[in-house]
Structure formats: C-alpha cells, structure tokens
C-alpha cells in the first residue's frame, strides 16, 4: 500500500508539471530562489500571469543516520499571486534497491513532504511562512537572532512558523521552531513573539518574549520511548532499549525460566557478547523538562528615510526568566544604501548568566547534547548550562551585508564581549557567508561558502558551535546542474574541551543532480 501511495504522488506531480509546462511562456522562474523560498514572477510578466511554477529534481547519493541511499527527489514550487507552496518528495533506495518506507508509513511523514507554505515576503504588511525557516529574528535580535530550523536538513526536517503583521500604528512578529515536537510524549516547542507600536511615523517601540518549553527536545528520540537515540540500542523499537532488554524478552518468549534467563545474560555479558547495561541505568526523559525564557523591550528611531539611504538608531534590553541575568544595547546604529549594502553596529553590556541572541543559528546543535565524561559515561548538557556559566561583560557587535551588482553577495558579523576583562570569556562570535551568483562564471551554476561560530572564548577554526560548509554547482546543460554540498559540524565527544581527531568531526557530503523541468 505504501508503494502505491508513493507512486500515485509522483504520478500526480509529473502530470501537474506537464500541465504547467504547456503554459509556461506566460511566466518566468528564477534559477535560484533559495533566499525567500518562493518563486518570484518576472516583473514584466506579472500582469500577464499571476501563476509561477517550478519543478526541480534531485538525484544522487545521500547519507541519513549513517546509512547510504540513492535519492530520487521531486521539488515542485508554485506561486499563485502571493501564495507560495513548496514540496520536498524524496524516494530513498537502499543498497538492495528497496524504498526506505519509514519515510512514508506514518501520518507525520506526509507533513515532512511540505517544504514551505508562504504568503507574501518579509517586510510586507502581512507575511506568513510554514515549514523550513532560513533566518528568523525578533526585533533587533537580543533574544532570537538568525534562528534557522534547517541546520540538519534533510537528515532531520522541522516544520516551523514565521509570521509578521505591520500596520500604520502597530505590528507583531511570531516564530515557532517545530510543530512536530508537539506530537508524542512530553510535547513542547521553542518559539517567541514581539508586538510593537509606532506612536510616530519614524519611532517604533516593541516588547518581546521567547522561550523553550523543553530543551531536552534537542535529544533525538525516534521511537518516543523517553530514551534518546544516542543511548538507545534499538532507536526504532520502543520495546527495547538495551541489549539485555532484547535478549531477556526473546529468551523468556522461548519458554526459559527467569532464573535461567538471568544466568544466561550474565554468561553473555561475561563473554563480552552483550553489554552489561540495563534500562534502569539510563535516564528516561519522558517526563523531564528543562525550560528557558526571556523577555525584552526595544525602541528604534529612523533618522533618515529616503529611497537610496536609510539611517536608524536603536536600543534594546532583555532579561532571562531563569537566571535574572540581563543585557542591553545602546546605542545601536544601522545604515542601509538600497540593496547595495547594510552596515550595523552596537555597544552592548550584560550581567552574569546572560547570553545575547540566545536562540541563534546554531541553537539546534546546542539545545541539548550528550557529552562523554572521559571514562565512557555519557551525560546531557543543555544550553541553559552555558547560560548559567556566562559572566558579566561588555563589548560590541558589528556586521555588514553586501550586494555587488548582483554578481557577488556576502555578509559578515562579529561580536566581542571582552572589553574591560583581563581574562578571556566565552562570548565571541563570528559569522560569514559569500555567494557567487549565477552566470558570473561559465559552467558555474552556484557557489557559496559559509562559516558560523557562536559564543566561544577564542575564535578557533573548530569548536562545538562551529558550522561550516559550501555548495558548488557545475552546470552541465541548460536547466541541469551537478551540485556538491559540504556540511561540517564538530562534537566534543570526550568532554575535554577540545576538538581533535576525525571522530569529533561530523562531515556530510552529498553529490546530486538538480534539474528544472
């Protein structure tokens, strides 16, 4: 039945693709729509057609949970006026040519096929997006700055929400990380909102709140049994957790007595054939929570407002509900010159137990994770632990965005909170991205490199909060590109505070063929 459903979905999409292709002369589709995840119509043709359509294909190797698959994917995107819909339909074939059916056998799996549903664009009076979130910021970013739920995509797909309303005198912003976390045991999400008023045309005053109802949701638990996959020997089966669970059940079902089973398990453990670990030795997170929350206020004043040049100043204050730690920025300044560049900077100061931009672009990696104590025992560390370890400091944050005549685009941001401190503290951040747009070089369909490192003592090439990677596309024919995607993160598995050795580097490399039909 599952195979029939998959075949039916693919057939319908290909049929719809052919139907739209027959009318495609009335609409144009940009080759790269990664920025806003919607298909934008060419302005010369907007009056002729309010419908845009793109059918993309992805073919190649992909690694999920350490297993290699051949991927056959369809990625249709359609725009009806302001409504945008994007799907991500992947059929994964294992080494035996069999379909990975666990991607299709539950109702929640079909939600994963939605890449995004959107209305409008950021900055418009009403904007809405459900699904993959590229970069989400509340206000000026003291609490939530640049959060993305696509960090582990496509290995793990999150379905979030981004919504904003802007009127003449007031407005609001809402962000949610992943509605899928509401399913199963101990449901919770991370999210926040901001409301603001504009008493004068150039003045905006806002208030924000954001929180995580359970940081432990950052621990992957596929079978939802309360034992995270990293310590669960049977992550896809909630009947077993340890090897002793499995063999005890099998031996008892065979008719052996409890005493005989216990004796045999001890013999197997003594021989080193199975682990001595029992389920009771592990921590069950089914009913455990670790909450975080922040509130904040902000104000911004537009000093210059013209078609080609804008100048804003701003200030913000926020406080942790967990630790009472606080932070403020004043003054902050932002200069924008059309679409060519944007420069921003602010002075900032914080108390103990506070981190600026707590919910940031690497949050899903830091939210909760297992760390080795050095003797082979694993324990969980959350980002709240990092919050409690933060110390009072002051410093600055500065950044810029650049668009060089649509040939090269880039952005960079740096934060240093070490002013007035003789010792180094864990609060330096560095982010950068450089992209070469299409048609700049022959045969190059896309090229992008990025690097992110948050809240570290020293800027080093490799840390646990480092995310680096790149995408390079080789155009082999019209509408066809061979893409090489590198994504690298790091994990301090032995808990020594250093990243060393290949086992602490997590590298994901995929090669795929992308086609636009």
Please identify what each model-predicted range represents:
Residues 23-73:
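Short glycine/proline- and aromatic-enriched beta-strand/turn motifs that initiate or cap beta-hairpins
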Residues 117, 434, 503-517:
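Outer-membrane beta-barrel "beta-signal"
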Residues 1-7:
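Bacterial N-terminal signal peptides that target proteins for export
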């Amino acid at each position: 039945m599952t195979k029939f459903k998959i075949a039916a979905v693919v057939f319908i999409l290909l049929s719809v693709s052919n139907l739209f292709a027959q009318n495609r002369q009335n609409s144009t589709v940009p080759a790269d729509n990664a920025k806003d995840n919607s298909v934008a119509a060419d302005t010369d043709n907007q009056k002729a057609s309010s419908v845009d359509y793109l059918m993309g294909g992805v073919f190649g190797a992909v690694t999920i949970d350490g297993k290699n698959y051949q991927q056959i994917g369809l990625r249709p995107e359609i725009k009806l006026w302001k409504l945008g819909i994007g799907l991500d339909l992947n059929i994964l074939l294992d080494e035996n040519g069999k379909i990975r059916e666990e991607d299709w056998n539950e109702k929640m799996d079909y939600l994963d096929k939605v890449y995004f549903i959107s209305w409008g664009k950021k900055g418009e009076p009403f904007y809405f997006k459900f699904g993959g979130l590229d970069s989400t910021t509340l206000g000026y970013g003291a609490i939530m700055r640049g959060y993305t739920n696509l960090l582990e995509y496509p290995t793990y797909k999150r379905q979030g929400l981004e919504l904003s309303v802007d009127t003449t005198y007031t407005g609001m912003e809402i962000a949610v990380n992943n509605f899928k976390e509401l399913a199963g045991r101990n449901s919770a999400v991370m999210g926040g909102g901001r409301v603001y008023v504009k008493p004068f045309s150039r003045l905006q005053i806002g208030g924000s709140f954001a929180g995580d109802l359970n940081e432990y949701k950052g621990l992957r638990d596929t079978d939802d049994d309360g034992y995270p996959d990293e310590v669960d020997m049977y992550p896809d089966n909630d009947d077993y957790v340890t090897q002793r669970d499995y063999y005890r059940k099998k031996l008892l079902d065979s008719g052996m007595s409890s005493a005989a089973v216990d004796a045999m398990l001890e013999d197997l453990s003594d021989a080193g054939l199975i682990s001595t670990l029992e389920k009771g030795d592990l921590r069950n997170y089914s009913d455990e929570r670790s909450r975080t929350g922040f509130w904040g206020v902000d104000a911004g004043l537009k000093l210059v407002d013209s078609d080609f040049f804008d100048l804003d100043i701003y200030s913000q204050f926020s406080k942790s509900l967990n630790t009472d730690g606080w932070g403020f920025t004043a003054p902050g300044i932002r200069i924008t010159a059309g679409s060519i560049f944007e420069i921003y900077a602010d002075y900032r100061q914080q108390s103990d137990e506070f981190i600026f931009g707590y919910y940031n672009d690497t949050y899903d990696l830091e939210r909760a994770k297992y760390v080795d104590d050095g003797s082979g025992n694993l324990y969980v560390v959350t980002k709240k632990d990092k919050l409690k370890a933060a110390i009072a400091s002051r410093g600055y944050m500065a950044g810029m965005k650049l668009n060089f005549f649509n040939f090269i685009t880039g952005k960079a941001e740096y934060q240093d909170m070490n002013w007035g401190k003789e010792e180094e503290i864990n609060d330096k951040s560095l982010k950068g991205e450089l992209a070469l747009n299409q048609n700049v070089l022959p045969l190059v369909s896309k090229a992008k490199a990025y690097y992110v490192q948050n809240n570290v003592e020293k800027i080093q090439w490799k840390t646990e909060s480092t995310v680096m990677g790149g995408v390079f596309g080789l155009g082999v024919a019209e509408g066809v590109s061979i893409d090489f995607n590198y994504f690298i993160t790091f994990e301090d598995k032995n808990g020594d505070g250093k990243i060393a050795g290949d086992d602490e580097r997590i590298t994901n490399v995929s090669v795929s063929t992308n086609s636009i039909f």
